[in-house]
């Protein structure tokens, strides 16, 4: 029984130390950052670009591009409102032609409330509503 109590006490002492380390970990500065993801074959001989994510001077994601071995598969561009929330997400095909775009509305807490998806000609394709339930 004493061993169990000593073990539990030691475990409780380690929890705050782990939390402090997580809080002290430096956050990645995303200002003007470009992240490139590469795929390499098992032998390390053939390297191909897989995905690129670009952030602006404010650290907001402004573009994502997905690649295949044949080149660009698709591209997403992100636009922001005056509150710094994504207001539109535009999706382009491999030839940079607009395919679909999404518009977003947010609730009073800044969480997504409604997502509208349109085709390239502006026809509404779908509406997604978000519901947040605290438990």
Give each language-model segment a name.
Residues 1-4, 21:
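Positively charged n-region of N-terminal signal peptides that target proteins for export
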Residues 7-16:
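Bacterial N-terminal signal peptides
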Residues 21-135:
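Buried hydrophobic residues that stabilize the cores of well-folded domains
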